[in-house]
Amino acid sequence: MRVLASHKHERTAQAIKEAVAAIISREVKDPRLGFVSVTKVDLARDLSQAKIYISVYGSEEDKKNSFIALNSAKGFIKGELASRVRLRIMPELYFVEDPSIEYGARIMEILEGLKKEAGENESES
């Protein structure tokens, strides 16, 4: 029974992720909202809270403005979510910055730098 409950929990989190992504991209009309993507949703066991991980492409100012826009549209997003995903209790939404894409980009920069250094060292030898 535990595996079934876990699977249902994952499906619910995925449904929330897809719905929130669609709402943000198509319904939220705030000019402060930059290029954002929903990367992950962590759902509390009792479905009372949903941490929505957001990746924002752009400068620190773009990130700040995007999170301000998301937090001001939180009520609207929750209402739209309630009409799209049928849950007995609609979770409280929390938008959290997901640094994983930036982290991955930084790793790629480091690897490219190492690759260039290795190429320069081979040409000097």
Swiss-Prot record:
- InterPro entries from the entry? KH_dom-like_a/b, RbfA, RbfA_dom_sf, Ribosome-bd_factorA_CS
* Listed GO biological process terms: maturation of SSU-rRNA
Q: What are the alphabetically sorted keywords of the record?
A: Cytoplasm, Ribosome biogenesis
**Which Gene3D superfamilies does the entry mention?**
3.30.300.20
Q: Which GO terms describe its molecular function?
A: ribosomal small subunit binding
GO cellular component labels: cytosol
Which superkingdom heads the taxonomic lineage of this protein's source? Bacteria
Q: Where in the cell is it found?
A: Cytoplasm
Pfam families (UniProt xref): RBFA (PF02033)
Q: How does it assemble?
A: Monomer. Binds 30S ribosomal subunits, but not 50S ribosomal subunits or 70S ribosomes.
As for what it does, the entry says: One of several proteins that assist in the late maturation steps of the functional core of the 30S ribosomal subunit. Associates with free 30S ribosomal subunits (but not with 30S subunits that are part of 70S ribosomes or polysomes). Required for efficient processing of 16S rRNA. May interact with the 5'-terminal helix region of 16S rRNA.
PANTHER family on file: RIBOSOME-BINDING FACTOR A, CHLOROPLASTIC-RELATED
As for family, the record states: Belongs to the RbfA family.
In Swiss-Prot or TrEMBL terms, this protein is called Ribosome-binding factor A
